[in-house]
Amino acid sequence: MGNGEAYMHWIDWVILVIPVMLVIFTGWRTRKYIRGVSDYLSCGRLCGRYVLNMGDTANALSIIGLVAYVEMKYKTGFSLSFWGNALIPLTVVCSLTGYCLYRFRETKAMSLGQFLEIRYSRRIRVFGAALRSLAEMLANMIMPAVAARFFMQMLNLPTHFSLFGLVNVPMYDFLMILFLTIAISLLCFGGTLAIVITGTLQAMFLYPLTLMLICFILYKFSWSNEIMPTVMDRVAGESFINPYDISKLRDFNFFSMVIVVGFNVIFHTATWIGSGTSSAAKSAHEQKMASILGNWSLQLMNILYLLIAVCLITFLNHKDFAVEANGVRQTLSSRSAAEVISNPETLEKVQKTIAEAPPIYHEIGNPPLSQAENLDTAFLDRIHKTLTDDARERTERALVSQNGGKELTEAQLASSEVQSKFNYAQGEANDSFQQVRTLFNQLNLSVTMRHLLPTGLFGAFCLLLFLAMLSTDDCRIFSATLTLAQDVILPLFPKGLSPKKHIWMVRWVAIGIGVFFYFGSKYMSQMDYIQLFNQMAVAIWNAGCPAVMVLGLYWKKGTTKAAWATLLTGILLSVAYILIQRNWANYVYPFLTDHNMVESVGSALSAFSSPFGDWIKWEMDPVKFPINAFEFLFFANIFTILFYIVVSLITCKEDFNMDRMLHRGKYSEAGVPKPAKQSW
């Protein structure tokens, strides 16, 4: 397919547009069922397990989730899934016991902030709710950017288009505004009620679409001749399928995907409680059953995710698709470079390097591929070299110009001042390369799928991802809206608001969050894999909240002072990590080089990580900060939990009355019967 060729047949457009219009119309019709604030915020707490399950299924499938999954599997394969299954008993026990969910429902709190006020204080309600909303918005604000780039690449849309021949509009901005407008409109129509109903309708479309795509992928590729040889072509220690041969994997490895995830199941169950539809169930039992059913209903989606990742690995690495794969890499890197590199001269050199890159016909096992050396790195290394060479050339020209047009002597070149300028120029080149590489990894799925899918099925795939994007966007925007409106803004009105004003206040907050998402997507530079970016973004809340939430629900000695100290400590640690990680290539590493500290800092990092063997290896890298977000957040959580316990034991003068918070014993409501046992 040529660069100017249209990818959507009219059949594809029909398949895409009609279901989307039906979903929007259904959301619009939910308005007449909103009779009060409870209906708008919590569906009147009338949802049963099956409605919640269907809505949660639609919300679970998302563009950003699929792209993040494919990024991870393309880098580390599928062997970690074996060890991930070891966590199933733990998750089942948590689901069956209603761990954290039951206790939260017993507090009768309708939001996180209300719980924080009941357990700690009114001030910590406002602070904690605002902090969680900010963390949630920072993590989710790249969703419109990921979706816009995805559809631009997949549909081969131009970077700009003319509006009525008067204004040249960036397609990237237009798509972000369009996606956010649709999602926020659904929220304004019916709030949680619209999310649940449209999510259920979308799930009805998603199941047959998913099944069709699974059948096509299995038909398109030969399992024995193409898929398995490609997946098995890895060096020792980085196997894609052998769970006992993964010691050299980085970023997504045994520690990040098993140890950290197991820790999160226990200590982060209550982190995002009270958001989205988690307060819409008519009872805690229905919420628990919806969670259990969700684990089963998502299996079809998991199969689709897995096969798409297998499809991508095979297409981009098997010699039968070498020419097409080279075209994909050229398209990806060219458009990524155009978005990141602002200097026209540098961009021209990079585009020339990309255009000259030949196809790579890799013979299976000769040599085996690895994370450090594979077909993508062979391509990207050419771009990195072009960027660094260009940075040095431009710096030399600037120095010659400052020297009156005379070439610098060896003594001048060796001076610390000149070397510092070279170091920072190299850092800027590394920073640009990191951004290009991130977009390259993020968008390879969209370009690959447009090369593979035929007419009709291509429209079905677009519909699948558009509905996935829509359900996820409105759910996550409303989650942040609910916390911000209920726990930050509403307490500012001591006399409360009328139901009508209350609902309109929530709507305006949702619109404001949509604006925040737009500007965040437009100006935020993503420097890492999506999962690692999300971990970093939510760290300002997640670093300190496990102790505050879980121990707040289960431990009577936790104090308000301990909660304040823990949350503030988590913020300080997280902000420091974010600043270092974001500015590592262009400022921090050049600074360390200037002051001859690279070796000493590298030795210190190696010493700290050495007790963990192959699980954690912190080695100096001029492009990427050695400590990834999973590792940082894990150790930050350990520290803040211990800190919370110590401060609580020091400041606790009287045990907190847990019975009053949970409405037990003499505090139980008169005339309210205990929930009847329900059959499975």
Predicted feature locations:
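Membrane-embedded helix-loop-helix hairpins and adjacent transmembrane boundary segments
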Residues: M1-W680
